[in-house]
Curated annotation (Swiss-Prot):
Matching NCBIfam families: PRK15394.1 (NF011923)
Name of the protein this chain belongs to: Probable 4-deoxy-4-formamido-L-arabinose-phosphoundecaprenol deformylase ArnD
Keyword Hydrolase: yes
GO molecular function, one term: hydrolase activity, acting on carbon-nitrogen (but not peptide) bonds, in linear amides
Name of the coding gene: arnD
């Protein structure tokens, strides 16, 4: 059974501590994945202002965010400037690429994108992407060929903004099938490879205990589905690393074969259906996010 493994790296600590651990685990399992890196300032602690929103507060309490992520992640960029992730930790991004993994852009400023992408102008969206692409390209010494919007905050404006960068594909939304997004002028954009499986922080809480998560998620893989699974370096690369190692072993026993997202693209892109990326909602996730539409 084919499956895509996507690894989002949102923070300085996730890069510094989570990425090396994940590279070790993936090497042991002989699995290649796609890493999407945030490369600018780590301002993730500024999300604490969202605690005044009941849905976000409930998510933080439900997932035990302080224990899961650590206070250094939850406070990053609040009382002091955010650390420059790419400048200080670019060698770990090169290490992921040298190990044979696919590497793409997650964000320049992850917090900034999540908080502002919905109302930034077209020029501001392009500038944020450009800063990230230029930085990651300089780090890797090669063209950046794929991207994934931070927090799945993507709509038709974001898809339009990304067209100028010539990405091979993007993974900006939640959905069920690989597709080509329709643009405002009637043409189609770079393929979208959506995520169709829930993440750890979206479901762990009253209904699913952390110890039961592996069984919960593996039960949702289906031969007829896309099976794109997202983990976070801040979670599965640190506190839940041993659980993730066990998940990969159990997946192999169930004939689930993880691969980089780019390997899920068909040989002939014209065979892909056309759809849209539009704003929607998802249980377990606060605020709007991009979803696949007709």
């Amino acid at each position: 059974m084919q499956a895509g493994l996507r690894i989002d790296v949102d923070t300085f600590r996730g890069t510094r501590e989570g990425v090396p651990r994940l590279l070790e685990i993936l090497d042991e399992a002989q699995i290649k994945a796609t890493f999407f890196f945030s490369v600018g300032p780590d301002n993730m602690g500024r999300h604490l202002w969202r605690l005044i929103r009941p849905q976000f507060l409930w998510k933080m309490l439900r997932s035990n965010a302080a224990g899961l992520y650590g206070w250094d992640i939850l406070l990053a960029g609040t009382a002091w400037p955010g650390k420059p992730i790419g400048r200080d930790l670019g060698h770990l991004m090169r290490q992921a690429r040298a190990a044979g993994h696919e590497v793409g852009l997650h964000a320049w400023d992850h917090h900034g994108w999540q908080a502002n992408a919905g109302h930034w102008s077209a020029a501001q969206l392009v500038e944020q992407i450009r800063q990230g692409v230029d930085t990651l390209s300089d780090i890797l010494g090669e063209k950046v060929t794929c991207s994934a919007a931070a927090g799945w905050r993507a709509d038709e404006r974001v898809i339009e903004a990304k067209q100028a960068f010539g990405f091979r594909y993007n993974s900006d939304c939640r959905g069920q099938r690989v597709f080509r997004p329709l643009l405002a002028d009637g043409s189609v954009g770079a393929p979208q490879i959506p995520v169709d499986l829930p993440t750890f922080d979206e479901v762990v809480g009253p209904s699913v205990a952390a110890k039961d998560f592996n069984a919960f998620i593996l039960d949702r893989f289906r031969p007829e589905n896309l099976n794109v699974y997202t983990i976070h370096a801040e979670v599965e690369g640190i506190l839940m690393a041993d659980d993730f190692r066990r998940l990969l072993a159990e997946a192999r026993q169930q004939n689930i074969h993880f691969q980089p997202l780019g390997d899920l693209l068909p040989e002939f892109l014209n065979s892909l259906p056309v759809g849209r990326v539009q704003r929607g909602a998802l249980e377990g996730r606060e605020g709007w996010l991009g979803v696949q539409g007709a």
